[in-house]
Structures are given as structure tokens and as C-alpha cells.
């Protein structure tokens, strides 16, 4: 399943998101959700322990001035890669 986090993790039900993640799921951080990619924050630590890959939309990182602050564990992607993720996963949950 593809999970997309659009909101800041401080404003989303992040605990529920973590509970629903399964092995093989992928999480895309976009819009204000990219703040979860900033190295050293508590939400990133939780994502590191999850059995998933985590991506962040590069355009949203740039728009928020975060490109130099994200963790090496996060995979920056562009809109083309975003489309590939949506095609790959038949189901999606937006947070």
C-alpha cells in the first residue's frame, strides 16, 4: 500500500499511520508532510524503525527550504516517480 502524508506530522494522526504500516508498504511525504524528513526529529526516528521505504517529493522539499536538512534515509523523488508509485500500488491511504 502507498501511504501519503500531506500534513505536518505534528498535526496528523501519526500514531495511527505507524500502526497501519505493513512490511512492503511505502510512504510518500509531500506538501507539509516533508517536515517528517528533517534529520533528527522524533517522527523520523519512528519511520526508521518501520519496515517501509520513505520518499519525499523533492519539489516540496525545495519549496520549504529543507533540501539540505533531510535524512539520508529519505529518498527524494520527483513527480514522475510519484506517478510510478501510484501505479505500483493498487491501494493508497492519504494522511
Swiss-Prot record:
User: Where is this gene product found?
Assistant: Cytoplasm
Kindly give the Gene3D superfamilies that the UniProt entry links to this protein. DsrEFH-like
Q: Which GO terms describe its cellular component?
A: sulfurtransferase complex
Q: Which domain of life is it from?
A: Bacteria
Q: Which residues cross the membrane?
A: none
Alphabetically list the UniProt keywords: Cytoplasm, tRNA processing
Q: Which InterPro entries match?
A: DsrEFH-like, Sulphur_relay_TusB, Sulphur_relay_TusB/DsrH
Q: Name one GO biological process term.
A: tRNA wobble position uridine thiolation
Principal location listed in the UniProt entry: cytoplasm
The record's function comment reads: Part of a sulfur-relay system required for 2-thiolation of 5-methylaminomethyl-2-thiouridine (mnm(5)s(2)U) at tRNA wobble positions.
* Entry's family note: Belongs to the DsrH/TusB family.
Assembly, in brief, is: Heterohexamer, formed by a dimer of trimers. The hexameric TusBCD complex contains 2 copies each of TusB, TusC and TusD. The TusBCD complex interacts with TusE.
HAMAP family the UniProt entry points to: Thiourid_synth_B
- Give the protein name, as stated in the record: Protein TusB
Q: Which gene encodes it?
A: tusB
